[in-house]
Amino acid sequence: MDAEAEVVHPVGIEMVHRTRPEDAFPRNWVRLGRDRFAVEAVLPHDHPFFAPVGDDLHDPLLVAEAMRQAAMLAFHAGYGIPLGYHFLLTELDYVCHPEHLGVGGEPTEIGLEVFCSDLKWRAGLPAQGRVGWAVHRGDRLAATGVAATRFSTPKAYRRMRGDVPVEGISLPETAPVPASPAGRARVEDVVLSGTGREGVWELRVDTRHPTLFQRPNDHVPGMLLLEAARQAACLVAGPAGIVPVEARTRFHRYSEFGSPCWIGAVVQPGADEDTVTVRVTGHQDGETVFSTVLSGPRAHG
């Protein structure tokens, strides 16, 4: 293996756009082919934000975040995309196999195979493309995923964003919904506020959150939108909540600071009473920010 092709944590945490080692999950990588990479990662068992869910399972959103980080690592280290470029997801789908995601009181080593395809190049670097993942725990397939992504130079990104402040600051002015019905143990992780309307909440953004905001950002991160979707799904699913082992998400535009973003959730009809499917959408200033369909077993009972 080419020594220059290996990035080992914690030296490479900037490669996954994290500033705190505890929030960076890949440990090393190796190229398997022109557009295929193997990434070794560790899922923590005691992460304060990505805590175990349901019957002591790794949070599917933790798995999705490990996928996202593995893709960023592959594009930076494997294709030479410079740090400082913007990594923009427009689609993100995943399927987790919960029987292989038990926590068991200790960190879990996983292997992620990253496949890149449909790459469009500009100035010798990928400008957009698709990425797929196969996540293994030992010899067991624990999850799969696919996404569509774009990359932007800092200059092009600022031109696209116009006069939006480089570093947005948002402190919540509304009370959070109760933590437990939203699928959270800590109130500081709740990202929804009540509106008095059934099935509709206001996105609650706190740029002081150590995991959701680790560096200056000019818009609400996609990770926070996915968390809002999960919490809304738990609230409409009822007291048992939901473990979102499957998700199909489309990001349509940025969610901006300083304007309310409304999160709506509706349970979808289904023949399987043991599985809950919820459609969640986010709207801001009359436009759709994102839409997602989450499916999974009830978290309790």
From Swiss-Prot:
Listed InterPro entries: AfsA-like (IPR047757), AfsA_hotdog_dom (IPR005509), HotDog_dom_sf (IPR029069)
Keywords annotated in UniProt: Plasmid, Transferase
Chemical reaction(s) catalysed: a medium-chain 3-oxoacyl-[ACP] + dihydroxyacetone phosphate = a (4-alkanoyl-5-oxo-2,5-dihydrofuran-3-yl)methyl phosphate + holo-[ACP] + H2O
One GO molecular-function entry: transferase activity
Entry's EC annotation: 2.3.1.277
Top EC class of this enzyme: transferase
Stated role: Involved in the biosynthesis of A factor (2-isocapryloyl-3R-hydroxymethyl-gamma-butyrolactone), a gamma-butyrolactone autoregulator that triggers secondary metabolism and morphogenesis in Streptomyces. Catalyzes beta-ketoacyl transfer from 8-methyl-3-oxononanoyl-acyl carrier protein (ACP) to the hydroxyl group of dihydroxyacetone phosphate (DHAP), thus producing an 8-methyl-3-oxononanoyl-DHAP ester.
Record-stated family: Belongs to the AfsA family.
Name under which the protein is recorded: 2-oxo-3-(phosphooxy)propyl 3-oxoalkanoate synthase
Origin species: Streptomyces griseus
Organism lineage: Bacteria, Bacillati, Actinomycetota, Actinomycetes, Kitasatosporales
